């Protein structure tokens, strides 16, 4: 958030073939405005971009999000765009990622080779930050998940995203954006796969979205008192109900991007959580 904090990181970049991967950010499903999310996702990106230009960095790969992309009418698959506007997307997180992506791409006019990747719902092992799908897996395995909700989303393995980012560094084209998605999966299917992987009891209660939406404000307040991130908020329920599909055909074609089966991701996540003593 402070330009001065980047000086040591960028020291000595001048005159060298340097590529910066900007993947710092806060993933938030909060329904209310959060200054910290804005400061990190938008102001932080501006500071990194400005430092790249100032220090003569050759290449910047900006890790955006599929949330920065406007939805298509009728649930049509979402593909890449080169126009980003906070007004075209819903929710604080999406708006911050759209604003940050627009600023990063505009730096091409200042001589910076900018490329953008848009991961979908990142999941997988090695999640020390307690991401939302990891929390769902953990709650299922420990018997704390009493009910699921209708809806679904596109989930992608963090290891496939990492490989896609490196491929973008090497094979991506300046000024281009690449969706790094996985596959669409309903919450019901996620829970069924976890049952098969772990042998734990099934979650048989699935809340309709209208009921989950009605309870979301109380849920957010409850988890705020516990100082824990809620699994479901008004914004996350909007996302689960959107039915959004994302095409990674461009990344597959130009970057050689591939994804592993989602069941493998869940099994590896469960195994890692066990090794960590979290389940």
Question: Where in the sequence are the language-model features?
Answer:
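Substrate-positioning beta->alpha
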Residues: 99, 132, 149-169, 176
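Mid/C-terminal beta-alpha module of Rossmann-like enzyme folds, strongest
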Residues: 164-231, 248, 253, 263-279
